[in-house]
Amino acid sequence: MDAIKKKMQAMKIEKDNALDRADAAEEKVRQMTDKLERIEEELRDTQKKMMQTENDLDKAQEDLSTANSNLEEKEKKVQEAEAEVAALNRRMTLLEEELERAEERLKLATAKLEEATHTADESERVRKVMENRSFQDEERANTVESQLKEAQMLAEEADRKYDEVARKLTMVEADLERAEERAETGENKIVELEEELRVVGNNLKSLEVSEEKALQREDSYEEQIRTVSARLKEAETRAEFAERSVQKLQKEVDRLEDELVHEKERYKSISEELDQTFQELSGY
């Protein structure tokens, strides 16, 4: 009986121990279950984080690819801008050289214009002198013409006198037989008339020579006037051509200056764009 009691007590103890172990096991299982649930929750969170990380990584890769593309595009633009700047620098150098040559041509044209102006002024002075001389020659020609008309009148008068003398001579010759005195008087008068006629003839010859010389001088003056007028016209033409050349060169210089200003503004704009591009690249 005691053995049974002992055994029952032992079994009860064992049962209590078993219950304790079962409770401990259940607690342990519950703890393990809770831990497993926490682990599974953490795993789910980790998976979500991994998925988010993968998404972020994909996005970062896309952003990196986009940034690389933008960087390559920017570098390409920078290279193109640098090439354009170099080309602009060469263009500016050429423009400056062209401006220097244009200034030299302008100086030369200005010197030629001044020379042409001086020549034109000199030609104008000569022309005025020649006009004055021409006016004097015209007065002389008028005087000679008046003298010639007077000589012609004298010649006509001499012709009339000669006709009268001839008529009287005929009358004297007709009356010669009737009156020697009248014939002698008539002969003396004929001698006087012949002397007068000789003087008139000499005057006519002198007037003819003077007229011929005056005509020769007038022709010479007219030739000189034509020569001076031609030289004056040529000088005026050269002056007009030089003035047009100066105007053309001035327009070309203005155009080059405008183009140079435009190129400088464009260079400034490109420099600002380059600075902005470098700032954007530095931001990446």
UniProtKB/Swiss-Prot annotation:
Pfam family name, one: Tropomyosin
Entries under SUPFAM superfamilies matching the protein: Tropomyosin (SSF57997)
Chain positions covered by the region annotation Disordered: 110-143
InterPro entries: Tropomyosin (IPR000533)
Lineage: Eukaryota, Metazoa, Ecdysozoa, Nematoda, Chromadorea
Protein name (database record): Tropomyosin
Keyword terms, alphabetized: Allergen, Coiled coil, Repeat
Domain comment quoted from the record: The molecule is in a coiled coil structure that is formed by 2 polypeptide chains. The sequence exhibits a prominent seven-residues periodicity.
Family: Belongs to the tropomyosin family.
Listed Basic and acidic residues bias regions: 110-142
Segments forming a coiled coil: 1-284
Function: Tropomyosin, in association with the troponin complex, plays a central role in the calcium dependent regulation of muscle contraction.
